Curated annotation (Swiss-Prot):
It is found in: Cytoplasm. This is Cytosolic Fe-S cluster assembly factor Nubp1 homolog. [4Fe-4S] cluster 2 binds at residues 240, 243. ATP binds at residues 63-70. GO terms for cellular component: cytosol.
Length: 311
C-alpha cells in the first residue's frame, strides 16, 4: 500500500514540494521534486485502475453545513439498493473530520479488514458496501485534526486501495464548502474521456442562507465540468404526526429550491419534509425502506429520476 503524505506535507504544487524537511522519507519525494512531473499526481493512475469497475460516481454536495447531506446520502443509498436489487452500490464517506455514515447506515463498531486486494469495505446489505474513516478510529469521539495534504492522502487511499469490486454506483458523502476534499476527489475521479461518469446532486434547505451557498457549489461544478443531476430540497416542511397538517419550519422567502433551480437551469429532483420517524431511524441506523409515508414516497420519486439520469 502506498503511504499517505507526511502530516506537514507542503503539497504537490508548492515550491517546496519534495524539498521540505517533511518530505524526507516520503516515497513520492522524487516525483514531487521533479519539475517535469510536479503537476502529475502519482496517485491518479492508481485511482483509475482501482475504480475501473465502478460505472458511475455521484457526489452529494452542498455549500452549507447542516442541510442533511449525510442523511440524504444514506436514504438514497438504501432506496436505490432496494429498488435495484440486481445492481451494486457503494458509499464513500469523505467527510474526514465529521464521518456520519457508520451511524446512519447501522455500522457503528464495525472494522475494516485487509485483503490481498486492499481494504475491504463494510457490507451493509447484499448489494451495498460502505467505507469511512470512522471505521479506522479507536473511538467515535476521537477528533481528526489534519491539514489538507493529509486529508487528500486519505481520500486517495480510499479511492485507490479499497477493494470496491464491481459497482453500478458509488455515492460520495462530502463535507460542506469547496475545500481540499472536494478538489482532491474531483481531480482523482474526473475522466475527460467519459465526463458523465462523475455527476453531482445538490442538497439544500428552503431558506436563502442555504441557497446562497448552494449556488456557489453549483458554480463550482460548472467550472469543473461536473454534470449536475439535480437538487433535493431537504426539510421543506414539517408534517405533524397528530393532526397531519404541514408547517414551514424554514420559510422559502425567495421561492426556495424551485426558484433557484429555475433561475440556474438545474432540475429539481424533489422535496423531503422533516420526518420524526425517519430521523429516529437514521439515528439508530435502521433500514427505512419499509416505511410508508410522504417522505418515502418522495424518496422513491427522487431515486427514479437519479437512475433515469444514468440511462
Amino acid at each position: 500500500m502506498q503511504a499517505p503524505p507526511p502530516e506537514h506535507c507542503p503539497g504537490l504544487e508548492s515550491e517546496q514540494a519534495g524539498k521540505a524537511s517533511a518530505c524526507a522519507g516520503c516515497p513520492n519525494q522524487g516525483v514531487c521534486s521533479d519539475p517535469n512531473k510536479k503537476l502529475e499526481d502519482p496517485g491518479k493512475a492508481l485511482v483509475v485502475e482501482s475504480m475501473k469497475d465502478v460505472k458511475h460516481k455521484l457526489l452529494i454536495l452542498s455549500g452549507k453545513g447542516g442541510v442533511g447531506k449525510s442523511t440524504v446520502t444514506s436514504l438514497l443509498t438504501r432506496y436505490l439498493a432496494r429498488s435495484n436489487p440486481d445492481s451494486n452500490f457503494g458509499v464513500l464517506d469523505i467527510d474526514i473530520c465529521g464521518p456520519s455514515q457508520p451511524r446512519l447506515m447501522g455500522a457503528l463498531g464495525e472494522s475494516v479488514h485487509q485483503s490481498g486486494y486492499g481494504w475491504s469495505p463494510v457490507g451493509i446489505e447484499d448489494n451495498v458496501c460502505l467505507m469511512s474513516i470512522g471505521f479506522l478510529l479507536g473511538s467515535v469521539d476521537d477528533a481528526i485534526i489534519w491539514r489538507g495534504p493529509k486529508k487528500n492522502g486519505m481520500i486517495r487511499q480510499f479511492l485507490s486501495e479499497v477493494d470496491w469490486g464491481n459497482l453500478d454506483l458509488l455515492l460520495l458523502d462530502t463535507p460542506p464548502g469547496t475545500s481540499d476534499e472536494h478538489l482532491s476527489v474531483v481531480s482523482y475521479l474526473k475522466d475527460d474521456t467519459n465526463p458523465e461518469s462523475l455527476c453531482a446532486v445538490m442538497v439544500t434547505t428552503p431558506q436563502e442562507v442555504s441557497l446562497l451557498d448552494v449556488r456557489k457549489e453549483i458554480n463550482f461544478c460548472k467550472k469543473q465540468n461536473i454534470p449536475i443531476v439535480g437538487v433535493i430540497e431537504n426539510m421543506s416542511s414539517f408534517r405533524c404526526g397528530n393532526c397531519g397538517n404541514s408547517s414551514e419550519i424554514f420559510p422559502a422567502k425567495t421561492g426556495g429550491a424551485a426558484a433557484m433551480c429555475a433561475e440556474m437551469g438545474i432540475p429539481l429532483l424533489g422535496s423531503l419534509p422533516l420526518d420524526q420517524q425517519i430521523a429516529k431511524a437514521c439515528d439508530s441506523g435502521e433500514d427505512i425502506t419499509e416505511f410508508k409515508n410522504v417522505t418515502t414516497e418522495a424518496l422513491d420519486g427522487i431515486c427514479s429520476k437519479i437512475i433515469a439520469s444514468f440511462s
